[in-house]
Design a protein with these regions (language model features):
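Active-site-proximal beta-alpha core segment in soluble small-molecule metabolic enzymes
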Residues: 4-7, 12-15, 28-187, 191-197, ...
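Active-site anion/phosphate-binding pocket segments in diverse small-molecule metabolic enzymes
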Residues: 1-10, 14, 65, 84-86, ...
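Conserved PLP-enzyme active-site core in the AAT-like
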Residues: 23
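Active-site phosphate/pyrophosphate- and oxyanion-stabilizing loops and adjacent acidic/basic residues
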Residues: 18, 146, 350
């Protein structure tokens, strides 16, 4: 076992996937958002469980992520959420990925690639209802559909939008976005096979109007709630723990500083322990002098600045080299959640989990 590793509890993932599926009506299909390596949890492992639990598809951010899943043997529909550039299109076509297009995408290039491949490309129509990121504005949908008539190898498979404030307590802005989405849908050739999707994690929990016929939960698959201000919550389990081990202990004498810049000075003689994880592993430097870890079931505060590959904590006299350190997860009666870590780092759980790229993953069933 490596000195530092990330433990992914597959049973927790399965639990969350079951809870989400049970929360939605049977007539609403569900895909698993597994972009960014399933928010750091392992895309292949997460998608395998999702399909076993009745999910019908996967969503990724980029064409290369979808290609990796195809190469791993997955045959389910794979939606790409980000717009493709011409250099992405041959891979997307070859791997049968469902790519999004709006009026900025090079449809001539896409049509040419499809024609050579003798394939019809299924595409999604992203609608910009207020996120102002990608997509066609509702009033421009008729023109886009008219434009598509000139491309016989490109077929509109469905449409989606993204709510910017669905995780807020007040839903007025999200509902206005759904009004705009309804306007866009009214122009489209909707039949029983046309996919309509607007329910992100917060929408899945809180906004039934957003469910349509395909929900796309993301963060809630992995345990965190979309936000701490939402009225409703699901019974979710955190699937990720981060584990390391003490490599060094020492006495820091009164008046001595520790770490780069000497930002922490001992007020009295104290014991410190060194943990071999740093910001290169994704443990945010903003946790310097603020974050905590668990050693022997006790909370130990980070002292000094987090280094590239290590950081130091204050600890009691019982701590020894080799002792287990929990950065996220449970130890004894104590627990540090990703929500606590992200709040301390002044960011969101998504970023904390996605940033932990260098730490090896160990998959367990607990």
């Amino acid at each position: 076992m490596p000195v530092s590793y990330m433990e992914i509890n597959l049973n927790a993932l399965r639990h969350n996937l079951k809870v989400i599926r049970a929360h939605l009506p049977k007539e609403v299909n569900v895909l698993a958002v597994v972009k960014a390596n399933a928010y750091g949890h392992g895309a292949k492992e997460t998608l395998r469980i999702a399909l076993e639990e009745g999910y019908v598809a996967a969503a990724v951010a980029r064409v290369e992520e979808g290609a990796e899943l195809r190469d791993a043997g997955f045959t389910c529909p794979i939606y790409v959420l980000g717009l493709p550039l011409p250099e992405d299109m041959p891979i997307g076509v070859n791997k049968d990925l469902i790519m999004p297009i709006d009026d900025t995408v090079d449809l001539d290039a896409m049509e040419a690639i499809a024609a050579v491949s003798k394939k019809t490309i299924e595409v999604m129509l992203p609608i910009d209802t207020g996120m102002n990121r990608i997509g066609t504005h509702p009033e421009d949908v008729p023109a886009l559909l008219k434009k598509l008539e000139a491309y016989p190898h490109i077929h509109a498979y469905g449409t989606f939008t993204h709510m910017a404030t669905a995780d807020h307590k007040e839903k007025d802005a999200a509902l206005k976005q759904l009004d705009r989405f309804d306007e866009a849908i009214s122009y489209m050739p909707v039949d029983e096979n046309f996919v309509i999707s607007s329910a992100n994690s917060a929408g899945v929990i809180d906004i039934p109007r957003s469910w349509h016929n395909l929900a796309r939960p993301g963060i809630i698959i992995y345990g965190p709630q979309p936000s701490d201000v939402m009225t409703n919550k699901l019974d979710l389990q955190y699937a990720m723990s981060v584990v390391s081990h003490v490599t060094h202990v020492q006495i820091l004498h009164k008046g001595e500083a520790i770490g780069y810049g000497g930002t922490y000075v001992a007020k009295e003689d104290m014991k410190t322990a060194t943990v071999p994880i740093g910001y290169a592993d994704g443990w945010h430097r903003s946790l310097s002098n603020k974050g905590v870890v668990l050693i022997n079931g006790k909370r130990c505060p980070i002292v000094g600045r987090i280094c590239m590959d290590q950081f130091m904590v204050a600890c009691d006299d019982e701590v020894r080299p080799g002792d287990e350190v929990i950065l996220m997860g449970k130890q004894g009666e104590e627990e540090i959640t990703v929500d606590e870590v992200s709040a301390t780092a002044e960011t969101i759980p998504h970023e904390i989990m996605c940033d932990l790229k260098r730490i090896p993953r160990v998959f367990v069933e607990k």
